[in-house]
């Protein structure tokens, strides 16, 4: 069972009460460049998105289609890092305190960064949830990441 954060719970409860659907959007962090990528996130927020999924750029984004893979590569070429992605999330949180923010990425970026450090930093940035596309459930690594995220009330989806 996925336990959502208070912000995500509130978003879904409000939508359910109004019998409305959620608008959940996606962008690749730092694409086409860091500044423009943040402006895209702000425009998405202004357009009525309830939750925004911010992709952590990865060289081998195998779970994504070819267009998103190319955007990942372009972002990395332009110098996007996990720290910069977290900074973008933080700026987006400051811009819209009500927006649900979810980081989506691959486990080796998180392991290289450090699971505890990652959980703490994204908590400070105001991230609500993490989707780790290549992390199997019920393995040691999933339990370790989930435990660190729960400590900071961040959902692992």
Regions from the language model: what does each represent?
Residues 2-15, 34, 58-70, 77-90, ...:
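Active-site-adjacent beta->alpha loops and helix N-cap segments on the catalytic face
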Residues 103-119, 123-134:
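Glycine/proline-rich, positively charged
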Residues 46-47, 125:
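Structural motif
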Residues 15-21, 47-62:
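N-terminal glycine-rich anion-binding loops that anchor highly charged ligand groups
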Residues 23-37, 101-114, 157:
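Active-site mouth loops of central-metabolism enzymes
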Residues 34-46, 117-118:
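Catalytic cores of alpha/beta
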Residues 25, 44, 55, 122:
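Conserved, mostly hydrophobic/aromatic
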Residues 24, 50-53, 131, 157:
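Conserved beta-strand positions in the central sheet of alpha/beta enzyme cores
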């Amino acid at each position: 069972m996925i336990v959502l954060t208070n912000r995500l719970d509130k978003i879904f409860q409000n939508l359910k009460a109004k019998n409305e659907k959620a608008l959940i959007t996606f962008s690749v962090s730092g694409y086409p460049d860091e500044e423009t990528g943040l402006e895209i996130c702000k425009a998405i927020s202004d357009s009525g998105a309830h939750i925004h999924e911010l992709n952590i750029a990865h060289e081998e984004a195998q779970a994504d289609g070819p267009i998103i893979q190319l955007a990942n590569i372009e972002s990395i070429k332009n110098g996007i890092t996990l720290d910069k992605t977290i900074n973008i999330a933080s700026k987006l949180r400051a811009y819209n305190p009500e927006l649900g923010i979810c980081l989506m990425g691959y486990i080796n970026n998180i392991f290289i960064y450090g699971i505890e450090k990652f959980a703490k930093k994204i908590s400070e940035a105001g991230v609500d949830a993490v989707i780790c596309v290549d992390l199997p459930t019920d393995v040691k690594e999933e339990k370790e990441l989930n435990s660190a995220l729960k400590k900071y009330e961040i959902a692992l989806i």
